């Protein structure tokens, strides 16, 4: 086991690492807390000293492009309605549905893990046994997960330290819970504020095996261990960078341009009064009369001119539009403002708009599949143990059937055209039916209706060979006999 001193050192070093610092920036931007919040306005006074201007407008508005980018990507990648775990073995598919595809808890946790991975650059999920004695999974905030390699530990074993702030007591002190995991058991610790780390006195079993349970009404407690540390990490990329990295500067520039324009409008929102021939006592009286009575007295040759200030907004507006375009481009997201909500928006235009998001989703899927394989390994081992089977990883594959919105009117027109084409082809076949045998005719009709002929051929009636042809031949024969009788001998009427 790790010593208390080791645990404190590992947690402190991890919190100060550049990796976690960058991850915290991603979290801050995802929550809409941008650098513009710290923006300050300064000026140089008459003595040449730099001072903060607290009277000038300093509007601070955050534009959460990153939040939209992440949520949009997560929902698109996980948009498949039938789940991702697939198998051609019906019994195995039923088990996979129970663990993953039809499990709302797993869907929610997987969405949280993928969100955390995109926001921070990496996120963890850990396995545990639920009340039904089945393996379940839960997202673990990676900011509180510390990976300890065996070479750095005193016991030469791999460890995972998982900490979180449990609550704040009545005195306002934060109570931190710390879990030290190894391949067999978990130690539980407690820390108040930055005080001493000590074993948690409220845990009845400490250390605790990964799983403890009882059989029926027995008073005996049994325990099991996974045999490995049940924490699995999902990385956004090889370097574990947040997806904020390529667009952070653009978002900051957009915030600055937008807030700068707001400040200009705020500072120049009132008109200037140019008063000529003023005979009042003082300017305060003039200001009061202007704002309240909407009138002012001037001399015989006096006059009042109202002047406004033109705000140079065109340059800022152009820069805002350029920044927004580049945020979506380099963030590889869908800019819905480029899609007009009209019937003229074709499926081809929609697909083109989704091209960058589709490319990003393809990259994410590769790492997501590797991650899901690790979860599958745990579940397959449990399924085989319970059912006495020998299912392998090769028996399972992943299918990400992402959904892209389409133009419903265009789809309806395509379906109508296709139906008309099929109707024309079937009519043509019926017109030449007298020249085809019944089996060939039915095969051609089934092809047009997307029906498997082999599935229905045994259900078809047993017609005489080429019935339409025989019927036509019979009719021709009757007509021939009648003509012969008409042309045979008889009385001639003159």
Where do the protein language model's features map onto the residues?
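Extended, regular secondary-structure scaffolds
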Residues: 118-120, 124-236
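Conserved aromatic-histidine-acidic binding/catalytic patches
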Residues: 30, 42, 54-58, 62, ...
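Residues in well-ordered beta-strands of folded domains
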Residues: 126, 181, 275, 399-401
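Short amphipathic alpha-helical segments
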Residues: 88, 92-95, 102, 106-110, ...
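Short secondary-structure junctions and interdomain/linker hinges
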Residues: 18, 103-110, 117-124, 241, ...
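C-terminal helix-loop subdomains that flank or include functional centers
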Residues: 283-296, 315, 322-494
